[in-house]
Amino acid sequence: MTKKALIIGGGIAGPVTAMALRRAGIDSEVFEAYDRGAEGVGAFLTLAVNGLEALRLLDLHDLVRDLGMDTPVMEIRNARGRLLATTSQPSRTLRRADLYQALRDEAVRRGVRIHYGKRLTGASATANGVRAVFADGGEAEGDLLVGADGLRSRTRALIDPGAPRARYVGLLNTGGYAEGVRAPGRPGVCYFIFGRRCFFGYMIHPEGQVWWFANPPSRREMPPEELAAITPEQWRARLMDLFEGDAGPMREIIAATPDILPGWNTYDFPRVPKWSGERMVLVGDAAHATSPSSGQGASMAVEDAVVLGKCLRDVPDTAKAFAAFERLRRERVERVVAQGKRNGDGKAPGAGGAFVRDLILPVVMRQVEKRNALAWMHDYRITWDERVAA
């Protein structure tokens, strides 16, 4: 009999997992907490080459090729405008909301049902599977449940009520899309600038718009209501002050941005002790959220989806399939999380740390390129036809 999966979360991991399971011969339904079109996600993200190759296994690479822009080059400068490093690695940068919508639409086209306004409140094992309960009073039953419900995963709390909280990494995020500004550079390059008091990144879209983000340091984790109370103009004023005196187009780009995005805290999960239990399993940020500084969050979610599909295809016992999935994924994703933390720590090092960073980073990056030291991250490939052992 064909298995049926209940997938909680309709971001990236959820729809991709549904399509991976479908290819593996497993039916699924996706349950998204927010109403249709209510995601309102204005930020952008980057899919690294390993994530793009994982999408290719599900015939989704053409889908993302129609969104955003290629960003295969990275240039890093300091607050004086000195070039510290240049690296190259295939990647594609796209708006998060566009990717969400494209993946959902494609999942539906392939026969996956997506339900909106379905916030998970509880789940429990039944004689033959699992039952999910939602805030609107509705219920659903399946053979297994996949928690693709992100950083604040309800599924994670159900699997392990004692699961640790996400770790705040000392950085805030904001950004936007600037219009009518002639920023130095060319399309296809991610420009990263270590300002004296704030990190900044920008990309030039082929149509001229400048996509940017900033990471103001904050030792204090700000409550959501406090962040929500900061107006776009207050963010603008704060950022203009943070970048005053730094070399680079930061202030011009910020001034040319009609709507600065609401700020948010940056978190990661160094280790989530339990990934599965009672016919439930975690994927993506629910299992191993990494800070944006890794550049790998979306790619890890896609890889998870494909590997879980293989495990459930090849290992008939659900619990053993979940164990195989964790065995294949945990070491890699936790290494990525650690790399993201190291990258983020360099964004707010203080004056002494900045001096050392500017001295050492060019040497380190040359060695990274020479030795291909990040091959473990970017050269990872999944073979769909390779069987998974229990």
At which residue positions do the language-model features occur?
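Conserved mid-domain beta->alpha element of the FAD-binding
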Residues: 7-27, 31, 146-147, 174, ...
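Conserved N-terminal helical subregion
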Residues: 1-5, 20-22, 48-160, 164-177, ...
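Short helix-loop capping/hinge motifs at secondary-structure junctions, enriched
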Residues: 180-186, 249, 314-315
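Conserved Rossmann-like nucleotide-cofactor binding loop
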Residues: 13, 36, 152
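Conserved N-terminal glycine-rich FAD pyrophosphate-binding loop of Rossmann-like flavoproteins
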Residues: 36-54
